[in-house]
Curated annotation (Swiss-Prot):
Null mutant phenotype: No visible phenotype, due to the redundancy with STL2. Stl1 and stl2 double mutants are impaired in cellulose production and exhibit a stunted growth.
UniProt keyword terms in alphabetical order: Glycoprotein, Glycosyltransferase, Golgi apparatus, Membrane, Signal-anchor, Transferase, Transmembrane, Transmembrane helix
Name under which the protein is recorded: Probable glycosyltransferase STELLO1
GO terms, biological process: plant-type cell wall cellulose biosynthetic process; regulation of plant-type cell wall cellulose biosynthetic process
Family: Belongs to the STELLO family.
Lumenal side: 72-771
Sugar-modified residues: 242, 729
Membrane topology type: Single-pass type II membrane protein
SS bond partners: none
Length: 771
């Protein structure tokens, strides 16, 4: 459908919504003078030239629409034309909210079913593999909404399916307004879920797979209570009053990608934020997730940034923090990967009078503006789903309402005000104003009225209005309120265009390092004060590795520091191996050793890395008596080796040349265990059991039992290594950016960390951005 022009309000009924700086049709009509009272022949002769021009115009319009409806090329569809219509007055629905009875479900087989967490999807084809994975998410009920194209025998165990016939029996008012062949029939599903106890609704797509199969891991599913995080959230700055919309993909590392619904005039704004502010969590009632693979992009991007047979596989930074939108700044919101809390359920309504690919985007902007009336906000989350690009035709024509109107809509919404005193009246007021302005038609005004009445009928309680912050003087943002975060600039290597000029060498190196170590877990034991260093270590190494697990002799829940004993550190590692079972390997390092990760790229991640080639780290000791420490440890090694299975025992004895008189000791400040040997490592830990075997003895024993030293990767053999002395003090002359690692290096404060980063910047210049 084409977007309708704004209808003129009746002279007897002035508009009830207040719109700033937007001309009305009454003002437009006053520009024209009254027609003269002429007889037809005189009028015809005086206006012959005008009639000819007008006739030509009519023929042109008819020809254009004929071509428009018979041509499927993107170039023609870029041009938009709105049909000229007679101005018609709109009537605002009058609803008696207190007279709407609550109507429980008495007809469906699920009349007595109640649950709080729902996943609502529209289905046109038989169940996809992605949809089957959604059904497996624990604690969430999948609700599949059919349309006229859905197979009659559609079925998926674990889901609830509502066919067209089943939908019709529910008796909702919105059914009179919904098309039969569109995904916007999801509105029926939202009402059904609310009627059956929904408190959270995940608006999903049947080709999207939730990453790790856990919505609670990615979204803030709980906003109140013991399970809620109640933490400050990074927020875009509101300091620039001229900025009304942002591209969230920049925040998550993809500055050359833009979401469907972003005004095309804003596509070129690719600079990251100078600074952010913070907002307290708990009112992010609409949570927009980012999708890896095929993110929500518009047809302009889809057609111009890829070849026909190339599938998109775009990745975003999973480590970027979630980010909130302040009042006055908007963001595109879709129906593919979005979590709605009950306070925003009214905002799930999908408009029916606009093109299908514009429906959820218009809903998102409409909903954001109304959310401000409740003191709520939208937050955007790091990758929560993976959508697969099936290389299907992407209909530009279905987005025509976006490219023509979305920029104007945002300006309109920021200027719009309402004087209504209840929230549902305010919702209806905005829908009326949007119909007046031609963003949708009177059909959606009536649909809004039906939707709001259905919400009450299924038991939904309308929220209470709060004062709008937009009309208050904005507080100045002080230096202490500024929060810095520099997004990664991930190169879009998948794109059909070259981006050589936009991605610096440093960024390219970072991507290369991240690609190499992105599935390696770094385990760090902190001997120093974690209160002063834990966050810094995560900042330094978290850019490179899959995750950074920090251990210390004392637990610190606030900093996510786990308790472990260094003497028996190997006994703690199996827990971490199990937690990150998909990791490619595990790199252990103590905080007195610096990793120059750029020099580890050549190492084989399928082999053991250790310091067996570093003479001061890996030594053989001959015990001198029965009671000294080395003798005790040697006896424990003999006891362990005697219980080893044949393959371990043979490896160990071959490596030590069956010499029972010496004990292999390794300082073990840094070592790497590949995934293929994780099971062997765990088996050896189990063999040690409760014995008091020190890690400097256990780790080399494990490695010699697991594989031949000839197979160890020699990458750490060239590290800078000096033994600590009682008067040890870090010296800048010790550090070398050309070595794979440096030991020792003392870090006990933020200032020590800054000094280290300044040294490491020789190998990784981007580190200077951290200080």
């Amino acid at each position: 459908m084409l977007v309708q022009d704004r209808a003129a309000p009746s002279p007897a009924k002035p508009p009830k919504s207040q719109i700033r700086e937007l001309p009305t049709h009454q003002q437009i009509r006053r520009r024209f003078s009254e027609p003269k009272n002429l007889d037809f022949s005189t009028w015809f002769s005086e206006n012959l030239s005008r009639i000819a021009v007008f006739s030509l115009l009519i023929v042109t319009i008819v020809a254009f629409f004929f071509l428009y409806n018979t041509t499927d090329t993107a170039s023609l569809l870029c041009f938009q034309s709105q049909s000229t219509q007679f101005l018609q007055s709109l009537s605002r629905p009058q609803i008696k909210w207190n007279s709407i009875p609550v109507v429980p479900d008495k007809t469906s087989p699920y009349a007595n079913f109640q649950t709080e967490k729902w996943i609502v999807v529209s289905v046109t084809k038989y169940p996809t593999e992605e949809l089957k994975s959604l059904v497996k998410i624990r604690g969430w009920q999948v609700l599949a909404i059919g349309n006229s194209a859905t197979p009659k025998d559609w079925s998926l165990k674990g889901s609830i399916f509502l066919s067209l016939d089943a939908q019709a029996e529910l008796g909702y008012r919105v059914l009179d307004h919904l098309p039969y062949d569109s995904f916007v029939r999801k509105s029926v599903g939202y009402l059904f879920a609310i009627q059956h106890g929904a408190k959270k609704i995940y608006d999903a797509d049947d080709r999207g797979e939730v990453i790790d199969g856990d919505l609670g891991k990615h979204f803030d599913v709980e906003l109140v209570g013991l399970d809620s995080k109640q933490e400050p959230i990074l927020q875009y700055s509101h300091e620039n009053p001229n900025r009304t919309v942002v591209n969230p993909y920049i925040h998550f590392g993809q500055r050359s990608v833009w979401p469907r619904g972003l005004p095309l005039e804003n596509v070129g704004e690719i600079n990251h934020e100078e600074y952010y502010t913070e907002v307290f969590g708990g009112k992010q009632f609409i949570q927009q997730g980012i999708s890896n693979g095929l993110p929500d992009v518009d047809s302009v991007f889809y057609f111009t940034r890829k070849t026909t047979l190339e599938a998109f596989d775009i990745r975003f930074d999973e480590h970027s923090p979630k980010v909130a939108l302040p009042q006055g700044v908007m963001v595109p919101v879709n129906s593919f990967n979005t979590l709605y809390h009950s306070s925003a359920f009214w905002g799930l309504m999908l408009p029916v009078s606009v093109s299908s690919m514009a429906s959820d985007v218009l809903r998102g902007y409409w909903g954001q503006r109304l959310l401000w009336e409740l003191g709520g906000y939208v937050a955007v989350y790091p990758p929560t789903a993976h959508r697969f690009d099936r290389i299907e035709a992407y209909p530009f024509v279905e987005e025509k309402d976006l490219h023509v109107n979305v920029g104007r809509l945002i300006k309109f919404l920021l200027a719009w005000r309402s004087e209504k005193h209840s929230f549902f009246e305010t919702v209806l007021d905005l829908s009326f104003a949007m119909a007046e302005e031609g963003f949708w038609t009177e059909q959606d005004l009536k649909f809004t009225a039906a939707w709001l009445q259905d919400l009450i009928a299924v038991g939904y309680q309308q929220p209470r209005l709060m004062s709008l912050e937009l009309d208050r003087p904005r507080a100045s943002i002080g230096h202490g309120d500024r929060k810095e975060f520099v997004p990664r600039k991930l190169p879009s290597v998948h794109l059909g265009v070259e981006e050589t000029g936009t991605v610096s060498t440093e960024i390219g190196n970072l991507i290369r390092w991240r690609k190499n170590f992105g599935n390696v877990v770094l385990v760090m034991f902190c001997n120093g004060p974690v209160e002063r260093t834990a966050l810094e270590w995560r900042l330094l190494y978290g850019r490179i590795f899959k995750t950074v697990v920090i251990l210390s002799s004392q637990k610190n829940s606030d900093l996510y520091v786990e308790e472990a004993k260094l003497d028996h550190i190997y006994k703690h590692l199996p827990k971490i191996f199990d937690r990150y079972s998909s990791a490619e390997g595990f790199l252990f390092v103590e905080d007195d050793t610096v990793l120059n990760y750029w020099n580890l790229l050549q190492a084989d991640k399928s082999k053991i890395w250790t310091t067996d080639k570093v003479s001061k780290s890996w030594t053989s000791v001959k015990p001198t008596g029965n009671s000294d420490w080395f003798s005790v440890q040697a006896e424990l090694v003999k006891k362990t080796v005697s219980t080893m299975p044949a393959h371990f025992q043979v490896n160990y004895k071959d490596a030590t040349k069956n010499n029972h008189e010496t004990l292999t000791v390794c300082s073990s400040e840094v070592f790497y265990v590949p995934k293929r040997l994780v099971t062997d490592f765990i088996d050896l830990v189990d063999l040690v059991g409760d014995m008091d075997l020190h890690y400097k003895v256990a780790v080399p024993m494990f490695f010699l039992s697991m594989d031949s030293p000839q197979n160890f990767d020699p990458v750490l053999g060239s590290m800078v290594y000096k033994r600590k002395s009682a008067s040890f003090n870090t010296s800048s002359s010790l550090y070398s950016a050309k070595a794979p690692a440096v030991h020792p290096w003392s870090i006990s404060s933020e200032q020590d960390f800054i000094k280290l980063v300044q040294q490491m910047a020789e190998g990784d210049p981007l580190l200077m951005e951290l200080v």
